[in-house]
Amino acid sequence: MTLWINGDWVTGQGALRVKRNPVSGEVLWQGNDADAAQVGQACRAARAAFPRWARLSFGDRQVRVERFAGLLESNKAELTAIIARETGKPRWEAATEVTAMINKIAISIKAYHVRTGEQRSEMPDGAASLRHRPHGVLAVFGPYNFPGHLPNGHIVPALLAGNTIIFKPSELTPWSGDAVMRLWQQAGLPPGVLNLVQGGRATGQALSALEDLDGLLFTGSANTGYQLHRQLSGQPEKILALEMGGNNPLIIDEVADIDAAVHLTIQSAFVTAGQRCTCARRLFLKSGTQGDAFLARLVAVSQRLTPGTWDDEPQPFIGGLISEQAAQQVVTAWQELEAMGGRTLLAPRLLQAGTSLLTPGIIEMTGVTGLPDEEVFGPLLRVWRYDTFDEAIRMANNTRFGLSCGLVSPEREKFDQLLLEARAGIVNWNKPLTGAASTAPFGGIGASGNHRPSAWYAADYCAWPMASLESDSLTLPATLNPGLDFSDEVVR
């Protein structure tokens, strides 16, 4: 039984789904998808549970969410292993994901009070109050690259605000979704407050098509996000939060410490095997001998990166991609770029057929035109050379995406210029693109999202503001507007 609906584990009535380790091929999880009828059942359960859950005090909801945080802590090793085995990422990185899930709880509680709590302003004849109310039933679509942390970033603030939820994990990470749901079950959520439906495209389409849905919170690819946006167009009554991908630029200016800059670039481009939405996809490098030296060092260090299994000792920097198909898509993208005129500096290689272990690739595209503006979700970095900083910014902004952007430079003035001109929701200076602060917004503009960033700002899209003018008594004003007569004279 792999679906959690209205407080019970049930068997899916859809197609059989089998999840294997992307490196070893070991079967990790299997179960049936939810069909459309079961998606509808989950929605009805969430709707029935909503009034009581929303009427609980914030403190009562907080107790259950904090209980979940405690369960994450006590089950950290087990959940780390599940995420690592299912995604292919090394144990060390999966452990940081579970830690981020735990830390998200306290941050979300604080964010609720700061961003969506209650405020009261006294007036001469009463008061003006601001409160926030939950939307109702929300669907949460999870991605596969961080199958615990990223859905958690929607689920936790949504529950704290008083919403009820239908959660669909990525079809590529059903085991992680299952494991997290079982911890929520132990946390004692009332039946129907959080429901789990497993499945792929058919399940997702059934979920997003539900009429009795008050909103949808999505993290994933731009293509799927665009489909959801089109599907929900003309329905302003539904909140839609989209956090999508990016064709992210990293600009390398003057560099005092080449190894430090190379380390930052590798952290930006190749961590998580390039499967972070904020990963650097495009590297803009200043022309000249220093740029040449940097590029040579980047290639030399990158070719030492050998992907390994999740439990290898010593631990590798990167593991496998989510699937062999995903790894092959990166290789195909590199071959297409090479055919268009790109100069390969480091060729990506599948270490073994039947696995997703892929080495990083670097290809120079200077002077090549007509390139597709698409995100290649893996360890493939494209390089361009530039002459002036203005040219670098123009090239960096030449994308429909707008998630992250970065600059390596000792000059604050250049960063100030980038802050004014960059088209991105995250703009970093001498920091990896993949770094983020949980107390700052996380999200982008353009094809990267719809201006509803997650992290600290997730509270904003999980509740709507309610304004009130209030007085505990009613009296006739001493001064009336023109034309109003409340005298005792009888009008004849």
From Swiss-Prot:
This is N-succinylglutamate 5-semialdehyde dehydrogenase. It holds the Pfam family Aldedh. Disulfide bonds: none annotated. It comes from Escherichia coli O6:K15:H31 (strain 536 / UPEC). The keyword Oxidoreductase applies. PROSITE patterns: ALDEHYDE_DEHYDR_CYS, ALDEHYDE_DEHYDR_GLU. Its EC number is 1.2.1.71. It is an enzyme of class 1 (oxidoreductase). The lineage of its organism: Bacteria, Pseudomonadati, Pseudomonadota, Gammaproteobacteria, Enterobacterales.
